[in-house]
């Protein structure tokens, strides 16, 4: 995993200092985009289940999974600056109903992220990977939750980043490497943490009405000012999905999401795979002016 960060950091630094044309920008003004508003629902209802049946469809427990997601961006394009503001939220619950027992409810997603990001539009690359822009960036964000989950305290983290980025390409929407400083207010006293982070986002039209989206990030923690059992050594998340247009801005498609984290204070790694089909809506409320 650590090699991923080293490779991404080297690639971004190379792009930033290579001999490319200076960027004058390809867009100007505000752009408001609802990237994704989606709902995933699956349900299994079993009546009179019994271990005497040989079919697993008649021995399983009734269950319902509901998950919603919002991804909104308000971006401003100037001649030498790209200012991005994002709101991301996801929340979901799983309802398990064993025969003859009380319903068990657990959360399968619970995250709210507000972030603002300022990037200097330093270079424009036109003949590599479909073209993109490159430059240094700095960002600050706040990560929390809709409610405290599973008996834990409500997560409250202020996170700042500074590094280099490739962005706004035909296919490569984002590739970055950054130094991270976190202020974690979840527990008292507050903990100041440092990390390296790398990530990317790719979007491409496979054919008319079918779009492929893939994104990922990897965060490698280095120091903590307060030692806690919940401290992470690293975390990584990745998602890939197909958006198949049904009608206007409404789409349906399969997706797979992977999340993995390693504990720093003890030798344990846990991961989560989530696959399914989602119904999603996306649109531009306002598009930036093309130059």
Segments and roles (model prediction):
Residues 42-67, 97-104:
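Surface-exposed strand-loop-strand hairpins of Gram-negative outer-membrane beta-barrel proteins
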